[in-house]
């Protein structure tokens, strides 16, 4: 079964600047930061009819993370290691949300994992 991309993050040192940039360049509707400092990007901006959700947040280094829906994040991390990748973030239960993890491919590109 093909695993769909279900979420993305765009992070950097100045999330206010990032919010404004993406609002302007793509016309995205982006919420103001929630108590966790995360601004959610509204659905329906393209792609599948339901859209792909996203967030703007503070990160030490700028990066975009695409999240792929998987059945078991821990099992997927183990598979990534077996294929030459590495763990970036162990599985973590987001308060009131899903279990997420991050891996890097053999070239170092970070991919997020979210439990289906």
Identify the residue ranges that each predicted region occupies:
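Mid-chain, well-packed structural core segment of small domains
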Residues: 59-87
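N-terminal first-folded block
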Residues: 7-43
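Short alpha-helical
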Residues: 16-17, 74-75, 98
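Short coil/loop residues immediately preceding or within conserved phosphate-binding loops
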Residues: 5, 51, 98
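Vicinal oxygen chelate
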Residues: 10, 77-78, 83-116
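Conserved short beta-strand elements that form part of the metal-binding/catalytic scaffold
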Residues: 28-62, 110-115
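N-terminal beta-strand motif that seeds the catalytic metal site of vicinal oxygen chelate
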Residues: 1-19, 64-66, 115-116
């Amino acid at each position: 079964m093909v695993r769909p991309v279900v979420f993305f993050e765009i992070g950097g040192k100045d999330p206010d600047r990032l919010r404004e940039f993406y609002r302007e360049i793509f016309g995205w509707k982006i919420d103001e930061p929630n108590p966790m400092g995360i601004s959610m990007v509204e659905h329906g901006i393209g792609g599948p009819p339901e859209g792909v959700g996203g967030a703007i947040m503070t990160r030490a280094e700028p990066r975009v993370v695409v999240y792929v829906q998987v059945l078991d994040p821990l099992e997927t991390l183990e598979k990534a290691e077996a294929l030459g990748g590495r763990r970036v973030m162990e599985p973590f239960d987001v308060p009131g949300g899903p279990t997420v993890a991050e891996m890097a491919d053999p070239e170092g590109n970070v991919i997020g994992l979210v439990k289906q």
